[in-house]
């Protein structure tokens, strides 16, 4: 039986969630704006600032244990109306760069995450067409055991990557649908997918591909913003919602362009809050409530 997403949702049943679980990729973003090394404490402070400023306007906030979740809890900056999602993935990749592989983080204790107030667990799968579905299923099963142990909803994110074998063909738009179909067997309570066509071009084409993802995955799903330019994201969310998505769980499109600002909290208030409010209005109007998915 699918676990309820009530604690992650707006009163409308739509999901308007902010991600700030980026780790080395976030360090790389800050490094582009400064000549000095980016310490862990700078990443933690950014996550605390995001939680303090944006959580009153988000239905949930996704945070990692490595740099964020304990500081956010200790400093009591999360709005009571905002659910907390704990990232349970270990991101493998170069310092200051994007993840190239993932694993279940052995240091994430699902019972501790639940006891400090988390209302969901998230895991990232990097999907390549030349890697075996069996290996992905093994990872997902390990993650789902954490969710079963804690009783927390399972949120599975998929990012489709080009194959490691460069001789193999790669059709991103088609493989978004193939990956969603595979994920329909993973017992996720919520699926997190990339926006078709990176949110650019014909809105109707985006909606049509979103409908295909809806039909393939069979569970509530939301879009992420990685790969979508911020000016296109609101329209992309609307197009995907019209295709059956239940909202968004996004980071970069909400806050990436204020990284490096001299006053991060002020920039979040000036730039990110209006953006988030607009996105919330869109999903309230167009998204399919998670509870309507049977």
Predicted feature residues:
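Hydrophobic, aromatic-enriched interface-forming segments
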Residues: 143-166, 170
């Amino acid at each position: 039986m699918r676990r309820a997403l009530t604690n992650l949702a707006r009163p409308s049943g739509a999901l308007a969630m902010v991600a700030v679980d980026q780790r080395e990729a976030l360090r790389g973003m800050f490094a582009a704006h400064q000549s000095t090394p980016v310490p862990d404490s700078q990443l933690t402070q950014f996550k605390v600032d995001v939680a303090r400023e944006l959580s009153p306007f988000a239905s949930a906030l996704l945070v990692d244990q490595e740099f964020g979740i304990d500081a956010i809890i200790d400093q009591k900056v999360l709005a009571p109306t905002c659910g907390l999602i704990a990232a349970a993935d270990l991101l493998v990749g170069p310092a200051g760069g994007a993840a190239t592989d993932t694993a279940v983080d052995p240091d994430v204790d699902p019972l501790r995450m639940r006891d400090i107030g988390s209302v969901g667990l998230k895991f990232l799968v990097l999907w390549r067409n030349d890697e075996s579905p069996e290996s992905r299923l093994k990872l997902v099963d390990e993650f789902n055991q954490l969710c079963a142990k804690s009783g927390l909803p399972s949120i599975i994110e998929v990012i489709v990557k080009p194959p490691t074998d460069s001789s193999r063909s790669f059709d991103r738009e088609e493989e978004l649908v193939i990956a969603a179909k595979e994920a329909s067997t993973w017992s996720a309570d919520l699926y997190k997918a990339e926006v078709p066509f990176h949110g650019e071009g014909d809105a109707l084409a985006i909606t049509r591909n979103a409908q295909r993802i809806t039909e393939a995955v069979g569970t509530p799903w939301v879009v992420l913003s990685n790969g979508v330019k911020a000016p296109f994201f609101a329209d992309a969310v609307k197009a995907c919602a019209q295709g059956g998505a239940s909202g968004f769980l996004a980071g970069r499109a909400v806050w990436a362009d204020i990284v490096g600002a001299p006053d991060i909290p002020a920039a979040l208030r000036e730039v990110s809050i209006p953006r988030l409010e607009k996105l919330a209005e869109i999903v309230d109007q167009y998204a399919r409530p998670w509870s309507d998915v049977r």
